[in-house]
């Protein structure tokens, strides 16, 4: 049975469920093989490495969220996107072209990560955390079944905990999901949650 999870501004994401309400295990496995997490993302980025099935972003915010979870049609296309590293050519307004650095990682559901729960720095909880800011969206709320999701002003959340830290300290002070320290600096707006 197909169920539409509606969000503000007409956003809807579809998921399949068994009649008992359990998620289709085949879809979860495919999702893990074809989902990318892209950080430091500009709205003007248009480079494409493979056919995209869906992009999950929060719409109409009057500011860049700087990250998105992207479903690519085939695992090979996902591998190609990762293989090219973190630099991609982006078409920007006024037809100018420039090199733009983004952070491309394979998305990993939190229950597939073997690390114990920890705080992720400013902006909420890190891996395994459960804090979600008011008005947040994410897997389990709108995107169907991966926990609480991204916090409103933080990467940390209960769903795909890619970075586990918030916007507030720059582009992230944790990177717990990938073993990085430090971050890019960049967006420094307000963060809510842990200190």
Curated annotation (Swiss-Prot):
<feature type="modified residue" description="Asymmetric dimethylarginine">
    <location>
        <position position="122"/>
    </location>
</feature>
<feature type="region of interest" description="Disordered">
    <location>
        <begin position="1"/>
        <end position="23"/>
    </location>
</feature>
<dbReference type="GO" id="GO:0005737">
    <property type="term" value="C:cytoplasm"/>
</dbReference>
<keyword id="KW-0597">Phosphoprotein</keyword>
<dbReference type="GO" id="GO:0005634">
    <property type="term" value="C:nucleus"/>
</dbReference>
<feature type="modified residue" description="Asymmetric dimethylarginine">
    <location>
        <position position="119"/>
    </location>
</feature>
<feature type="domain" description="RRM">
    <location>
        <begin position="32"/>
        <end position="48"/>
    </location>
</feature>
<keyword id="KW-0963">Cytoplasm</keyword>
<dbReference type="InterPro" id="IPR012677">
    <property type="entry name" value="Nucleotide-bd_a/b_plait_sf"/>
</dbReference>
<feature type="compositionally biased region" description="Basic and acidic residues">
    <location>
        <begin position="12"/>
        <end position="23"/>
    </location>
</feature>
<keyword id="KW-0539">Nucleus</keyword>
<protein>
    <recommendedName>
        <fullName>Heterogeneous nuclear ribonucleoprotein A/B</fullName>
    </recommendedName>
</protein>
<keyword id="KW-0687">Ribonucleoprotein</keyword>
<comment type="function">
    <text>May regulate mRNA translation and stability. It binds to poly(A) and poly(U) regions of RNA. This binding is inhibited when the protein is phosphorylated.</text>
</comment>
<keyword id="KW-0694">RNA-binding</keyword>
<dbReference type="InterPro" id="IPR035979">
    <property type="entry name" value="RBD_domain_sf"/>
</dbReference>
<dbReference type="GO" id="GO:0003723">
    <property type="term" value="F:RNA binding"/>
</dbReference>
<dbReference type="GO" id="GO:1990904">
    <property type="term" value="C:ribonucleoprotein complex"/>
</dbReference>
<keyword id="KW-0488">Methylation</keyword>
<feature type="modified residue" description="Phosphoserine; by CK2">
    <location>
        <position position="173"/>
    </location>
</feature>
């Amino acid at each position: 049975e197909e169920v539409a999870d509606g969000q503000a501004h007409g956003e809807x994401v579809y998921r399949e469920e068994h009649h008992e309400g359990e998620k289709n295990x085949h879809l979860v496995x495919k999702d893990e093989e074809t989902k990318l997490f892209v950080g430091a993302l500009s709205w003007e980025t248009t480079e494409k490495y493979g056919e995209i099935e869906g992009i999950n972003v929060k719409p109409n915010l009057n500011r860049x969220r700087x990250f998105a979870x992207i479903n690519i049609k085939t695992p090979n296309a996902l591998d190609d996107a990762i293989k090219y590293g973190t630099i991609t050519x982006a078409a920007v307004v006024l037809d100018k072209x420039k090199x733009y650095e983004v952070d491309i990682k394979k998305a990993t559901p939190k229950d597939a990560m073997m690390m114990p729960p920890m705080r992720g720095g400013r902006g909420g909880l890190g891996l395994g955390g459960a804090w979600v800011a008011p008005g947040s969206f994410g897997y389990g709320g709108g995107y169907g079944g991966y926990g609480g999701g991204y916090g409103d002003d933080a990467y940390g959340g209960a769903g795909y905990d890619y970075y586990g830290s918030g916007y507030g300290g720059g582009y992230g002070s944790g990177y717990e999901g990938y073993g990085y320290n430090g971050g890019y600096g960049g967006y420094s707006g307000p963060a809510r949650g842990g200190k």
